[in-house]
């Protein structure tokens, strides 16, 4: 996988995740809407980590800020996974498969970043 396509995956994932959040909020009510707000925060943490990583790679931000990339990614992905687990217990009538798909995408995002960091 080229470096350019590896950089485009996080952008694609954020669009997919935000579309899923919109779908959940439209069809599941207020609890789902609160879950979506928390999920947007989770996705924002992952996007912030990607932006910081891109700024470091382009030498616009000093290298010593690289220590914040992984904590932001882990915090965003794990909080999204935790939100998905909590939401499935709260949203009894909601589409649980969509919520678990969100958790799966956040976990995939984390593993993709790990793989790109090791072999990139």
Curated annotation (Swiss-Prot):
Induction info: Expressed in the intermediate phase of the viral replicative cycle.
Primary location class: membrane
GO CC terms of this entry: membrane
UniProt entry tagged with the keyword Ligase: no
Residues passing through the membrane, by range: 9-29, 32-52, 68-88, 94-114
Keyword entries, A-Z: Membrane, Transmembrane, Transmembrane helix
Compartmental location: Membrane
Name of the protein: Uncharacterized protein gp19
